[in-house]
UniProtKB/Swiss-Prot annotation:
Taxonomy of the source species: Eukaryota, Viridiplantae, Streptophyta, Embryophyta, Tracheophyta
EC id: 2.7.11.1
Signal peptide: 1-27
UniProt xrefs under InterPro entries: Kinase-like_dom_sf, Leu-rich_rpt, LRR_dom_sf, LRR_N_plant-typ, LRR_R13L4/SHOC2-like, Prot_kinase_dom, Protein_kinase_ATP_BS, Ser-Thr/Tyr_kinase_cat_dom
Transmembrane annotation, as ranges: 237-257
One Gene Ontology molecular-function label: protein serine kinase activity
Sites of Phosphotyrosine modification: 469
Residues holding ATP: 305-313, 327
UniProt topological domain (Cytoplasmic) ranges: 258-634
Membrane topology field: Single-pass type I membrane protein
Family named by the database record: Belongs to the protein kinase superfamily. Ser/Thr protein kinase family.
Reactions this protein catalyses: L-seryl-[protein] + ATP = O-phospho-L-seryl-[protein] + ADP + H(+); L-threonyl-[protein] + ATP = O-phospho-L-threonyl-[protein] + ADP + H(+)
Protein name: Probable LRR receptor-like serine/threonine-protein kinase At2g23950
Organism: Arabidopsis thaliana
């Protein structure tokens, strides 16, 4: 009897062990190699803000982790942790994330060499390691990144020869290697935009246009949404002894089937969201109207940041905390279809410069056109000139130079060139460092793809419109130069263009008033009273001279924006001023400067720049005085 009990207990023990073995083997999964690679990356980085806090090495699913983006097939396609104060080194294990399309680790303190393993990522399209402390050479095998489109390694300490293999990447459209210690020569690139400024060993023997630094870009903003996680805790099934081996196996199989079914349903929901919101055009993201409607609280009036001739701008906030500015374009019924709209957007997106507002994405439908931009925390120059505390003189000078560089890029370095058509303080935005960022460029064409026989109104802002544009409808780079001159006067005086002269009960044209004070050497009467005595009188006088040069009556007499940049930086102003001062036209503008004739044949005299006639006009109101065809470059 005792022997039988012992035999029974041994058999039962064996069955119990088999039960747990089968249960564990069926319900467990092999370690995900992507998890292993990501944990290695985490372990080599110092994370002061805890952004990798939920990266669990025992997890089987990294798609629930922050800073990770996954495809509908549950594969890691994006790694992005910009501006998180990360330090340490970048692990070579990143090369095991073979499905990566985007790596965005800019604005950190990561040091060491760029791991050569990163060049083994066959699907990588975007690599941004800018503004870190990487050193050593750029891996020579970088040409293996055959799908790479966007590469930023600027502002590091990289050295060694300029990697000629970069020219072998067929789809590369943007390259920024500025401010490193690379040495030449520089080969020809398929990239439409590239920058090598700030590399002394290259630039001292290179052409000026290669090292002008005019193509430095705003950081690419990559949206990496965290996917919903799958259930990672497997219920430890402790089966009662009395149920036996067969019941244990059945329960285990049932549990695994249910878990996999739930995972598939979750992945379907994630896939639906990605296909709605991530249909991008190059580096642009295509948003759904529903996403932007939710982000802006239904485009509520409380979310409005500003209003202009092209439409309202709303503050938007996505679920991941990203804050953006959403411009809802008006008058879209007459615009062209999505194809032409997206083509124009692609051209705007190629205009990449630190002093140009970067386009993040768009929404295009039969009834809506929306553009999504980064949110500028310091607002516009127009709003800051009225805010407290007042902008100091050095900041105003910095704004003037930054805005000039942005327009210089649009006019002379962008291909095709872009004419802004509405240069004013409200369209010059300020980032967190009070760097000037030119906004609203290229929008005139987005809203004017009508048939050739259809006319459109002159677009601009009262007080900023050049006389030739108002009278003929023909715009050029010199139209923008005129508007920039008015902007300089606003920076000096702290007033809007229509307020010039009102402060001293001046009833004449405002430019004549400014010229009169300058000629009488009464510059201090022009300076914003909020500055007190904390400004450099010589610098104010020089900026005033540049403003007067920019606002000359004849477009041919105005300088190009490249010349404006040089003069603001202290080069060539005296010579240009002396030459212009000799022309009789400078102080005696033609009366047609202030008189225009309407298209119906009736003479209507309007003091374009005086205090009378526009006292009740709003500075943001677009002027639609005449219907006439616009032509010329973009």
């Amino acid at each position: 009897m005792v022997v039988m009990k012992l035999i029974t207990m041994k058999i039962f023990s064996v069955l119990l062990l088999l039960c747990f073995f089968v249960t564990c083997s069926l319900s467990s999964e092999p370690r995900n190699p992507e998890v292993e690679a990501l944990i290695n990356i985490k372990n080599e980085l110092h994370d002061p803000h805890g952004v990798f806090k939920n990266w669990d090495e025992f997890s089987v699913d990294p798609c629930s982790w922050t800073m990770i983006s996954c495809s509908s097939d549950n594969l890691v396609i994006g790694l992005g942790a910009p501006s998180q104060s990360l330090s340490g080194t970048l692990s070579g294990s990143i090369g095991n994330l073979t499905n990566l399309r985007q790596v965005s680790l800019q604005n950190n303190n990561i040091s060491g060499k760029i791991p050569p393993e990163i060049c083994s990522l066959p699907k990588l399209q975007t690599l941004d390691l800018s503004n870190n402390r990487f050193s050593g050479e750029i891996p020579g095998s970088v040409n293996q990144l055959s799908n790479l489109q966007y590469l930023r390694l600027n502002n590091n300490s990289l050295s060694g020869p300029f990697p000629a293999s970069l020219s072998q990447i067929p789809h590369l459209s943007f390259l920024d290697l500025s401010y490193n210690n690379l040495r030449g020569p520089v080969p020809k690139f398929p990239a439409r935009t590239f920058n090598v400024a700030g590399n002394p060993l290259i630039c001292k023997n290179s052409l000026p246009e290669i090292c002008s630094g005019s193509i430095s870009a705003s950081p690419l903003s990559v949206s990496l949404r965290s996917s919903s996680g799958r259930r990672t805790n497997i219920l430890a099934v402790a089966l009662g002894v009395s149920l036996g081996f067969a019941v244990s196996v059945i329960l285990s199989l049932g549990f695994i089937w249910y878990r996999k079914k739930q995972r598939r349903l979750t992945m379907l929901r994630i896939s639906d969201k990605q296909e709605e919101g991530l249909l991008g055009l190059g580096n642009l993201r295509s948003f759904t109207f529903r996403e932007l409607h939710v982000a802006t609280d239904g485009f509520s009036s409380k979310s409005i940041l500003g209003a202009g001739g092209f439409g309202n701008v709303y503050r938007g906030k996505f679920g991941d905390g990203t804050v953006v500015a959403v411009k809802r374009l008006k008058d879209v019924n007459g615009t062209s279809g999505n194809s032409q709209f997206r083509t124009e957007l692609e051209m705007i997106s190629l205009a990449v410069h630190r002093n140009l507002l970067r386009l993040i994405g768009y929404c295009a439908s039969s009834s809506e056109r929306l553009l999504v931009y980064p949110y500028m925390s310091n607002g516009s120059v127009a709003s800051r000139l009225k805010a407290k505390p007042a902008l100091d003189w050095n900041t105003r000078k910095k704004i003037a130079i930054g805005a000039a560089r942005g327009l210089f890029y649009l006019h002379e370095q962008c291909d095709p060139k872009i004419i802004h058509r509405d240069v004013k303080a409200a369209n010059i935005l300020l980032d967190e460092y009070f760097e000037a960022v030119v906004g609203d460029f290229g929008l005139a064409k987005l809203l004017n793809h009508e048939d050739s026989h259809v006319t459109t109104a002159v677009r601009g802002t009262v007080g900023h419109i050049a006389p030739e544009y108002l009278s003929t409808g023909q715009s050029s780079e010199k139209t923008d130069v005129f508007g920039f001159g008015i902007l300089l006067l606003e920076l000096i005086t702290g007033m809007r263009a229509l307020e010039f002269g009102k402060s001293v009960s001046q009833k004449g044209a405002m430019l004549e008033w400014v010229r009169k004070l300058h000629k009488e050497m009464k510059v201090e009467e022009l300076v914003d009273r909020e500055l007190g005595t904390t400004y450099d009188r010589i610098e104010v006088g020089e900026m005033l001279q540049v403003a007067l040069l920019c606002t000359q009556f004849l477009p041919a007499h105005r300088p190009k924006m490249s010349e404006v940049v040089q003069m603001l930086e202290g080069d060539g102003l005296a010579e240009r001023w002396a030459a212009s001062h000799d022309h009789s036209h400078f102080y005696h503008a033609n009366m047609s400067y202030r008189t225009i004739t309407s298209t119906d044949g009736n003479n209507q005299t309007k003091h374009l720049f005086g205090s009378s006639g526009f006292e009740d006009e709003d500075d943001n109101q677009a002027l639609d005085s005449f219907a006439m065809e616009l032509s010329g470059p973009r």
